[in-house]
Amino acid sequence: MDWTALRAAAVEAASHAYAPYSRLHVGAAALVVDGRLLQACNGENASYGRGLCAEWGLVPQLHSPGGGRLVAMACRSGDGELLMPCGRCRQLLWEQGGPELLIDSPRGPVPMTEVLPDAFGARDLPA
């Protein structure tokens, strides 16, 4: 796993962010189990609550060519600062990568079980 390249891809993605309100440019980069590298950025609009986090932009890219599973993800600001996913995005990442998905964190790469302990998932839904 080349975390340096993944982090650089996240910074590059942040350069494309549309963030005229918060001015927080966010980029996410993820590695798929089949080797694909995905990149996405955040996008805001004037009705503040309807913006999209960078991590959400990864999902259509993952599933459009046929799916897969995320195995590693890094999130960075436009200045290269490490950013952790918000709570909503942590749930999304759990769905797309499961407990083994590695997330870049201040302590280095950690599994989703540390980022979202006791996660809610499909097993919690009625059969």
Spans of model-derived segments:
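C-terminal binding/interaction regions
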Residues: 2-16, 65-127
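Short beta-strand scaffold segments in enzyme catalytic cores
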Residues: 23-32
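A general structural signal for well-ordered alpha-helical segments in protein cores
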Residues: 7, 55-59
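Active-site catalytic pocket residues across diverse enzymes, especially alpha/beta-hydrolases
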Residues: 62
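Short Gly/Pro-enriched turn/cap motifs at secondary-structure boundaries
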Residues: 18-21
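Compact, glycine-rich, soluble single-domain proteins
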Residues: 42-56
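Histidine- and/or cysteine-centered catalytic micro-motif in compact active-site loops
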Residues: 31-33, 42-43
